[in-house]
UniProtKB/Swiss-Prot annotation:
SUPFAM superfamilies: DNA helicase RuvA subunit, C-terminal domain (SSF46929), Nucleic acid-binding proteins (SSF50249), RuvA domain 2-like (SSF47781). Keywords: Cytoplasm, DNA damage, DNA recombination, DNA repair, DNA-binding. The RuvA-RuvB-RuvC complex processes Holliday junction (HJ) DNA during genetic recombination and DNA repair, while the RuvA-RuvB complex plays an important role in the rescue of blocked DNA replication forks via replication fork reversal (RFR). RuvA specifically binds to HJ cruciform DNA, conferring on it an open structure. The RuvB hexamer acts as an ATP-dependent pump, pulling dsDNA into and through the RuvAB complex. HJ branch migration allows RuvC to scan DNA until it finds its consensus sequence, where it cleaves and resolves the cruciform DNA. Homotetramer. Forms an RuvA(8)-RuvB(12)-Holliday junction (HJ) complex. HJ DNA is sandwiched between 2 RuvA tetramers; dsDNA enters through RuvA and exits via RuvB. An RuvB hexamer assembles on each DNA strand where it exits the tetramer. Each RuvB hexamer is contacted by two RuvA subunits (via domain III) on 2 adjacent RuvB subunits; this complex drives branch migration. In the full resolvosome a probable DNA-RuvA(4)-RuvB(12)-RuvC(2) complex forms which resolves the HJ. This is Holliday junction branch migration complex subunit RuvA. Residues 66-140 are annotated as: Domain II. One of its GO terms (biological process) is DNA recombination. Gene3D superfamilies: 5' to 3' exonuclease, C-terminal subdomain, DNA helicase RuvA subunit, C-terminal domain, Nucleic acid-binding proteins. The gene is ruvA. GO terms for molecular function: ATP binding; four-way junction DNA binding; four-way junction helicase activity. Has three domains with a flexible linker between the domains II and III and assumes an 'L' shape. Domain III is highly mobile and contacts RuvB. GO terms for cellular component: cytoplasm; Holliday junction helicase complex; Holliday junction resolvase complex.
Amino acid sequence: MISQVRGTIMHRELDRVEIMTASGVAYECLIPLSVFESLPSEGQTVTLHTHLVVREDAWHLYGFAHAYERAVFQKLLHAKGVGPALALGILSALTPDRVVRALHEKDVLTLMRVPRVGRKKAEQIILDLADKIDAVGPAPATGTAPSPLGDDAVRALIALGYNQTEADRAVRAVVESGAPKDVSSLVRGALSRLTAK
């Protein structure tokens, strides 16, 4: 089992990255959008936690920034009708901790934000995983715990057209810079960061 790959980024795309290891072997890892956004530039060193899927016709290596994110991916594979491509799509649309919270809270609507996940599929994922998701362990420390205030702000940004990943990231940055008193000020702060890009 290949559980981790460390090396130099040779090439990267939205859904994959090619890494040349010190031994001279290059690995192509399929990645969620959140990993692509956090990758250093080509020529820089990166370490990814990986999961290998072996099929009769191909071997695919999936790469993640944290072991926790990989654990959520692996747990998603235990849901009926969820293969590696859909599990990767879920982690491209939602952060790992948001996936875990959605499962704990049986939040069908959050899972339905993911392309190719309708109500029936979301309900099936929750049915299969809601009682098992604790096995992935705690999320890595980020300095800021999720809050109802932050969740409301993220929902507001998504309603304005931003995706889950960028909304989560902007809201977390505002919270870390100083706790806002209400949702509207948090949304305004997040919007100023998003529009400044």
